[in-house]
Amino acid sequence: MAYVTIDDSEHLEKALKRFKRQVEKEGIIREWKKKEFYEKPSTVLNRKNKALRRKLMKKTRRSRDSKSY
């Protein structure tokens, strides 16, 4: 959980910026957006498989390009 301690001499805007940065770093908003709507288990599986195939294709392309002839 993200939290920020504020000093008496610190401006509120600066503390809000620090809080926003910390929330983005922890991925809280991204996780919330993922869980905002229900997603069927089959859809989740299809999305993960698609990402895995994309990752493998990228890896094979890189290995093919890096070969020296």
UniProtKB/Swiss-Prot annotation:
Signal peptide: none annotated. Keywords: Ribonucleoprotein, Ribosomal protein. The keyword Glycoprotein does not apply. Gene3D superfamilies: Ribosomal protein S8. GO terms for cellular component: ribonucleoprotein complex; ribosome. It holds the Pfam family Ribosomal_S21. One of its GO terms (molecular function) is structural constituent of ribosome. One of its GO terms (biological process) is translation. Belongs to the bacterial ribosomal protein bS21 family. NCBIfam families: S21p. This is Small ribosomal subunit protein bS21. It comes from Treponema denticola (strain ATCC 35405 / DSM 14222 / CIP 103919 / JCM 8153 / KCTC 15104).
